[in-house]
Amino acid sequence: MALAAYRHLLRATRVAFNEDITLLTSARKQARSTFLANRSLALESPESIAAIAHAEDVAQFLRRNVVQGQKVEGDEKYKLNIHEHTERGDNDTIKMPNGKNVTIDGKTCKD
């Protein structure tokens, strides 16, 4: 389980930081040091299970929610590295915690 979570995390860093070697290297070093720090945990211990779940959550977050951008030379625009794993949504998907739709000036996004 831990090895699979580690591999998922490394793959997610490659997807999220593919163009940025410095950040890719830093993220992988952080993942490695965290896994090495937890190496002595028993496989079925609650701490180990929580650490593996955290690694899987981080991998999922990196894969779906991190998008890097590069400034276009000679322009005030950025080119975003949106990939097939990037979570996409529209304004209709924004919900309040209690399940109500967001309304602005009495209107929803559908109005």
UniProtKB/Swiss-Prot annotation:
UniProt source species: Botryotinia fuckeliana (strain B05.10)
Gene Ontology MF, one: protein folding chaperone
Main localization (coarse): mitochondrion
Subcellular location: Mitochondrion matrix
InterPro entries xrefs: Complex1_LYR_LYRM7, MZM1/LYRM7
Protein's name according to its UniProt entry: Mitochondrial zinc maintenance protein 1, mitochondrial
Subunit structure: Interacts with RIP1.
Family to which the UniProt record says this protein belongs: Belongs to the complex I LYR family. MZM1 subfamily.
Record key words, sorted: Chaperone, Mitochondrion, Transit peptide
Functional note: Assembly factor required for Rieske Fe-S protein RIP1 incorporation into the cytochrome b-c1 (CIII) complex. Functions as a chaperone, binding to this subunit within the mitochondrial matrix and stabilizing it prior to its translocation and insertion into the late CIII dimeric intermediate within the mitochondrial inner membrane. Modulates the mitochondrial matrix zinc pool.
Biological processes annotated in GO: mitochondrial respiratory chain complex III assembly
This protein's record includes keyword Isomerase: no
Region: Disordered, residue numbers: 88-111
Record-level GO cellular component terms: mitochondrial matrix
